Amino acid sequence: MKVLVVGNGGREHAIAWKVAQSPLVKELYVAKGNAGIWEIAKRVDISPTDVEKLAEFAKNEGVDFTIVGPEAPLVEGIVDEFEKRGLKIFGPNKEAAKLEGSKAFAKTFMKKYGIPTARYEVFTDFEKAKEYVEKVGAPIVVKADGLAAGKGAVVCETVEKAIETLDRFLNKKIFGKSSERVVIEEFLEGEEASYIVMINGDRYVPLPTSQDHKRLLDEDKGPNTGGMGAYSPTPVINEEVEKRIREEIVERVIKGLKEEGIYYRGFLYAGLMITKEGPKVLEFNVRLGDPEAQPILMRVKNDFLETLLNFYEGKDVHIKEDERYALDVVLASRGYPEKPETGKIIHGLDYLKSMEDVVVFHAGTKKEGNFTVTSGGRVLNVCAYGKTLKEAKERAYEAIRYVCFEGMHYRKDIGDKAFKYLSE
């Protein structure tokens, strides 16, 4: 069958890598992809957000199944465009994608259906927002309402920083329409984790658990990013916590969507804070996480394409997990997340291909002649398997020694938060 993967990042490389392993695939396309994906899939030169053009391409080429990686095309209504033409596509429609497309919508939804989350207020007026922040104090979290590539949530340790962030969002509109409205919410203490499920109507199937590292620098310092690394599974989500996540969050979301008359088919990612009171939702995303998808898909033992197709058709599926840990370290460009430098030649990629239990997923890369060069903020995901998390971590960081590009930056502490829970 012909399969199309939509997106350009590390998550999409992981999806394409996993799908390419299926004997069901006759032809694999990617729009637009990156230097890594182009080694295993045909490049389609259409932007992921040009949803009508993509739907036309899929119709004309006879694409049998499409998997959407990033949030922007989903919020733009790619699923609606494909379904209008009778095409099979895995992802939520435009209405359902509001769970990620609007923080205010998501918070209102959570409040209405009793889904545990931080207390919050929504503002469009700078003066009113400033007044509120001065009244409640810091630490506090300021979030742009719309999509901001993972950079729209700012943890403000001081009132001054909160006001400065509000000014950048509401007055300077650094994210355009996405920051015309802000959500201000209480700062939650605890341990972050990611819980991702596949939903089709009222059925859902959990994927392996994971933990992301959102801040740019070690020890969770520096600005928020799209994610600097992840590992799976995470001991932060034990059996008892998982039971609560399923009952208090996932099942209430499904019930709420049903009551709102919204049909949801696709991935749902709950970004969680595991607090003393239990799991609370920081955000919903309507797609796989990036970088979480990379270690998660490395640990899925199923023929992933077959599993998705069966689930899409409403059949029962079960995810078989690899016993090993998988850990992903993101290599980023100098200047990320504000103004990443690009066009730097990447050295050492061929050597990494020969390393056992190491997988490299490309993100911001492209081809220039015979060279692979950087083309974005997050450049590569160097991932490794290990019988223990410690082994996976050592193997990934060992592999990083062989790859370099000018201005390369990465965190040295991916996975460290787990060690206090593990007796390795």
UniProtKB/Swiss-Prot annotation:
- Which biological process, per GO, is one annotated for this protein? 'de novo' IMP biosynthetic process
Tell me the cofactor note.
Answer: Binds 1 Mg(2+) or Mn(2+) ion per subunit.
Q: What is its EC number?
A: 6.3.4.13
Which InterPro entries has this protein been placed in? ATP-grasp, ATP_grasp_subdomain_1, PreATP-grasp_dom_sf, PRibGlycinamid_synth_ATP-grasp, PRibGlycinamide_synth, PRibGlycinamide_synth_C-dom, PRibGlycinamide_synth_C_sf, PRibGlycinamide_synth_CS
NCBIfam families cross-referenced by the UniProt entry: purD (TIGR00877)
What protein family does this chain belong to? Belongs to the GARS family.
Q: What is this protein called?
A: Phosphoribosylamine--glycine ligase
Taxonomic classification: Bacteria, Pseudomonadati, Aquificota, Aquificia, Aquificales
Q: Which gene encodes it?
A: purD
